[in-house]
Amino acid sequence: MRPCRSLRTAALAVVLTVLLHPVALGRATPGESEQNYLWQRRYECYASNGTQRLLDRCAYNREEFVRFDSDIGEFRAVSELGRQVAESWNLEYLQQARAEVDRVCRHNYELFQGLPVLLQTQPRVSVSPSKKGPLQHHSLLVCHVTDFYPGHVQVRWFLNGREETAGVVSTHPIHNGDWTFQILVMLEMTPHQGDVYTCHVEHPSLDSPITVEWKAQSDSARSKMLAGVGGLVLGLVSLAVGVFMHRRSKKAQQGCR
C-alpha cells in the first residue's frame, strides 16, 4: 500500500500528517470465527518555532490503543489493549521511534516547504440569501467560500461599492475532510431595489481577488426578467427550426432537378 501524505496548518503550528499503511483490512485465520478487523497507523508531525514533535498513533477497529510521543520519548498505552504492546515496543523499537522525528517529520517538512505553490488550492465562491423574501425586509446574505488551501482567507462585503463592516458574521475556517477548507461569511441586510451586494475574496492562491455580486430585485422585476429570457430562448429555438427547414427544403428542390 502506498504512503499517503497530507499537509495541514493550525494556529501557531504546522501539522504534517503522514499516513503509513493507513488502512489494513483482514480476516480471521482458518479455524477461528470469521470476523473482519481494521488496523490503522498514523504519523503526525507538528512543527513550531524550529522544533519537531512526532506522534505515532496505532488504532484497532478505529480505537487508538498505543501511542508514541517524541516529547515524552516512549510508547504509552492509550487503552488496556495497548499495555503489553507499549511494553514490548519500548524494548524493541524505542530507538527507531525516536529517530523517526528526523526521518519522517523534519525531512517531509523541509520537502513540503520547498513546494508552496503545489499546496495552494483556489476557492470557489457563491452568494445567496438565507431565505427568499420581499425587498426592504431584514434578511441575511451568505457568501460561501469553499475548497481553498491554505486556510487563511479574507472575505469582505461591499454594498454599492462601499465596504460593509457592521452586521458581518463569520464562521471559522472549517475542514472539508480533505486538506481544503470552507467558510461562511454572512451580512445582515435590508435590500432595496437596485442594490448591488458584492462578496470580495482574497486568498494566497489567487493572482487577483474573486468578486461575486448579488443584485436586489423585486419579485415583479425578477418575473419580467425571466419572461424576457424565456422569450429570447423561444425566439432562438424558432429561428433555428426555421433555418433547418429552409435548408432541408432547398436540398429537396435540388434533388428533384
Swiss-Prot record:
Localization annotation: Membrane
InterPro entries registered for this protein in UniProt: Ig-like_dom (IPR007110), Ig-like_dom_sf (IPR036179), Ig-like_fold (IPR013783), Ig/MHC_CS (IPR003006), Ig_C1-set (IPR003597), MHC/Immunoglobulin (IPR050160), MHC_I/II-like_Ag-recog (IPR011162), MHC_II_a/b_N (IPR014745)
Keyword Flavoprotein: no
Any GO CC annotation of this UniProt entry: MHC class II protein complex
Stretches assigned to the Extracellular side: 30-224
Keywords assigned by UniProt, alphabetized: Adaptive immunity, Disulfide bond, Glycoprotein, Immunity, Membrane, MHC II, Signal, Transmembrane, Transmembrane helix
A GO BP annotation: adaptive immune response
Region (Beta-2): 121-214
UniProt membrane topology term: Single-pass type I membrane protein
Cytoplasmic side of membrane: 246-257
Pfam families according to UniProt: C1-set (PF07654), MHC_II_beta (PF00969)
Signal peptide: 1-29
Main localization of the protein described in the UniProt heading: membrane
Residue ranges crossing the lipid bilayer per the database entry: 225-245
Residue ranges constituting the Ig-like C1-type domain according to the UniProt record: 123-211
Positions of the UniProt region annotated as Beta-1: 30-120
Highest taxon listed in the record's lineage: Eukaryota
Keyword Disulfide bond: yes
Span list, region Connecting peptide: 215-224
Glycosylated sites: N49
Disulphide bonds in the chain: C45-C105, C143-C199
Gene3D superfamilies found in the cross-reference section: Class II Histocompatibility Antigen, M Beta Chain, Chain B, domain 1, Immunoglobulins
PANTHER family referenced in this protein's UniProt entry, alphabetically: HLA CLASS II HISTOCOMPATIBILITY ANTIGEN, DP BETA 1 CHAIN, MHC CLASS II-RELATED
Family stated for the protein in its record: Belongs to the MHC class II family.
Name of the featured protein: RLA class II histocompatibility antigen, DP beta chain
